[in-house]
UniProtKB/Swiss-Prot annotation:
Its main location: cytoplasm. This is Ribosomal RNA small subunit methyltransferase A. It comes from Pseudomonas fluorescens (strain Pf0-1). It is found in: Cytoplasm. Its EC number is 2.1.1.182. SMART domains: rADc. Belongs to the class I-like SAM-binding methyltransferase superfamily. rRNA adenine N(6)-methyltransferase family. RsmA subfamily.
Amino acid sequence: MTEQYQHKARKRFGQNFLHDAGVIDRILRSINAKAGDRMLEIGPGQGALTAGILNSGAQLDVVELDKDLIPILNQQFAGKSNFNLHQGDALKFDFNSLNAAPNSLRVVGNLPYNISTPLIFHLLNNAGIIRDMHFMLQKEVVERLAAGPGGGDWGRLSIMVQYHCRVEHLFNVGPGAFNPPPKVDSAIVRLVPHAVLPHPAKDHRLLERVVREAFNQRRKTLRNTLKQLLSNAEIEAAGVDGSLRPEQLDLAAFVRLADKLAEQPAKAPEAD
C-alpha cells in the first residue's frame, strides 16, 4: 500500500489489515474469481483482496463500515467499472438489494473477529442467493465451524452453519500476515450453501431453538437441557437417548428433535 493510502487500523472496528503478498495470492487462488462472477466483499479495509478480485473481471460490490476508508478505496479503485462501494454496517446490510440471481452471489471478506459469528448468521438468512463464501476468521471459529459431533468444538455454530452449508477449512494464517498482528491465529474457510438441504427441518427456527437450549448447559444431559421443550418420552420418540449430552448428537438427531417439537402446536417458534 502506498503512503497516500495509509490508514491506521482502528481497534473499535476490529481492524487487522492483511499485507502478506503470499497469503493474499493464496486466498485469491482459493476464491478463483472469474469474469462474470457477481461478488461481494465485506470489510475490504485497504483493498488487499479487492484489487485481485477486480482484476479477474468479476463484478464487485464492497461494504465498508469505516467512513475514513471510503475516500481511500474510491481513489484507489477509481475508474474501475466493475467496482461499487457501499458505506455501512454489514450486519444491517440488505443483501437482497444487490438483486443477485439465486445461487449466484460469491461473498468474501477478512471479517472483524468481533462480529464474525453474527455476520455469518445474517448471511445464512440470505443463503438462497449465495453461491459460496470465503472468509478469513479466527482459527478457533473456523475449527468450530468445521467440527463434527463428539468434541468440544461441536456446538450451535457448527450445527446451524452445517445445516445450511458445506464447510471447508482451507488453510491457517499466522499473525505476521497482518498489520497490526492479531493476538490469535487466523484461518480461511469456504462455506458452500447446500443445493438441497441434507437434513431439512420442518421449521428451521425450531431447530435453532432446540440447539440453543441444548447447548446453553452443554455438560448436562438432553433430558435436563430440553425439559422445557420436550419430555424425555418425546426425546426418545425422536430416536434420541435422553441421557446423552448435546455434543454427542449429530445434525440429523437435532433435526429429529426439532421436528418432534413441531408436532406440538402450542409451542410456536420464539421471535429471534
